[in-house]
A protein has these predicted regions:
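Short hydrophobic alpha-helices and adjacent helix-cap/hinge residues
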Residues: 1-187
Length: 187
């Protein structure tokens, strides 16, 4: 994390007039820069959630957020010149639409990857389904647990009683930590 911060400062030795950050993880990692060299530089944070990990260890561990390991985004941001654009999930509305279009659905398959935002979204869909759709079964299909080939096999086995929500499916290839969509051709 410190290396990423150093790389940003080395790449941009002159403080910018403003910074746009996409996603809470990018903000949590780069916020210390705004405590020092870029203090008071305006920030626009896109796709933020109401709560964020209380520390980087929680973010990097990719564990579900709880009241104990997270804080309200307003609290985290109180010392910064920041505007937050929240991104709602619309999970309940999506599930209502699926039920309206396919009333025979008894199970929801949720496709996601191993990134932090997918962990948070899986947590949110579990909560919404337990509260508002208790008679729907949830099946989580995650790139950290199954391969792309297994995902495709699973999807082809579904009948009309399964609704599918695709959220994300990024896979890491090799040790270079670069992520690619798994349907891209590798050279």
């Amino acid at each position: 994390v410190r290396q990423a911060q150093a790389n940003i400062l080395q790449t941009y030795p002159t403080p910018p007039k403003a910074v746009i950050i996409v996603g809470d993880p990018g903000w949590l990692v780069s916020a210390p820069i705004f405590d020092g060299p870029w203090k008071d530089i305006p920030v626009i944070l896109c796709y933020s959630r109401k709560r964020v990990p209380a520390d980087l260890q929680t973010l990097l561990s990719k564990i579900p957020l709880t009241e104990e390991n997270s804080i309200p985004i307003e609290e985290f941001n109180k010392n910064y010149n920041i505007t937050v654009l929240e991104q709602p999930y619309y999970i309940k509305q999506t599930l209502e639409l699926i039920r309206q279009l396919q009333p025979e659905v008894k199970r929801i398959a949720f496709i996601s990857d191993d990134r932090y935002i997918s962990v948070v979204t899986r947590q949110a869909i579990k909560e919404v389904m337990q509260k508002d759709f208790p008679n729907l079964q949830l099946e989580l299909l995650s790139s950290e647990q199954i391969s792309t080939e297994e995902l495709l096999d699973t999807l082809t086995s579904y009948k009309k009683t399964t609704g599918v929500i695709y959220y994300a499916w990024l896979r890491q290839y090799g040790s270079n930590k670069n992520y690619y969509l798994s349907d891209h051709l590798k050279k």
